[in-house]
Each structure stands twice: as C-alpha cells, then as structure tokens.
Amino acid sequence: MKKLLIAFCFSLLASGMQAQADTTLQGSVRYLLTHNWTKKMAAVDYLSQQSRERIAYMWGKRSEWKEYTTLYFSPAVSRYEESEERAEADDMGYSWRREPLSLRRDFDKGSLSDYITMASKTYWVEDTLVPQHWKIHNDLKEVAGHVCMKATWEDTLKKQKVVAWFAQDIPLQAGPERFCGLPGLILEADLNDGALLISADRIIMRRMGKELDHPKKIKAKKVKEEQYTQAIRKYMDERRKEEEPYFWGMRY
C-alpha cells in the first residue's frame, strides 16, 4: 500500500510538471520578414545582365519589403501563417494579395500538413515530418530577449544557405516557414546572407486552442512531399527558361 501511495504521489508530481510545461511552453511568435530584392536577384545565377537591369528598373529604389507572420506553438504541435498585421504602409497604391498559407507540424505523430501556394496553385502537402539536417555551431547571440545558438543548413534545390538561431530556453522543435527540428524554438532565420531575414520581434506565452488547427475550407490539391518537391523543381526549370526569378511565384 505504501509503495502504491508513493507511486501515486510521483504520478501527481509528474502530471503537475507536465501541466506546467504544457502551459508555459505554449504561445505565439510574431516574425518580421524583411525581403531584400537586390540580394535575392544576386543569388539567381541564371539571369542575364539585361534581365537584371530590367527588373532593377521595375523595382526602382524600393529594394526591401517587410511583412509579419505568426507561429502558434505547443510542445506537441505548431502552426505557421501570414499575419493580418501590416509591417509597413503600402505606398505602392495597392495591397498584396494574401495567398493561402498554413504550415502545421505534429511533433508527437511525426507528421506535417501544409497548405502552401505556388504559381497561383494551392497545394495540401501531407506526409511524414522530415526535419532539415542542421549543423549546430557554438556561436551565441540574443534574439527577442533570448540567448540563441546558431545552426546552419543548405537548401540544394533552391540554392539557399540558411543560418538559424534557436532559443535553448524554449526547448521546442518548431520554427518559421518550413524550418523545424532543432532542440529549441527557432527565433531567427537568415537566407542567403540577408536576401530574406526572418526575425522574432514579439513572443506571447499563453495556452493555445484552435489556433493550432488549420483554417476551414481551403481548396487545394493534396500531394505528398516528393510530389510537391517535383512541382517546385518543374516550376523553377520553367522560370529558368523564361529568365524570370523563381521567387516571384513561390515562397523564397
């Protein structure tokens, strides 16, 4: 009887600790995305000088564009989407059309479920979750008030070098865009030396509910990860032939 009582006490303690962890490790992150068109263009190796000059003329002096995104997270699940908040005034006379984006990770089940748009076509990618193969470094820096450790990964399909910074004091695998799999919440990601900088600027810890679920009624073509990768490769090949930047029709 005494052993059962001790076991029960330990069970209550463990449950209490788990409940506390579930509460304290839930919340949302607002990320500021800074797109640098000049650096994005420089990373596209197939454009002729004439194409570069034409595109540079079209964009004029506006080399940067900023937007907000939001990541909702818990120990088991995360979901990432574009934010309703505006990061800057739209001084070009029109608003950017928001396309369906909802990237969901279930870390307990090891699965992903992503609604993502490419070339005006929305895909519903459902498959096993395979995180990026990160290399962790000893470098440290502060992001949004948290001491973060550096990790790197190279996207060989899009030819992007990614530098991520993850918070060791928030031991979750989640991150912005399709990044995940580090031993801490990813608070910053730098793609191709500033071509796209994703940086957390607000973290709110609170219990999550329906925020972790996909929005309803998203029309999309259901595919596996490999099929989506093939679609990316095909689209990039088409853009190469047309001498147009691939990132105009898909997420960078």
Each model region followed by its residue ranges:
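Extended soluble regions of mature proteins
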Residues: 21-252
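Bacterial Sec-dependent N-terminal signal peptides
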Residues: 1-24, 250-252
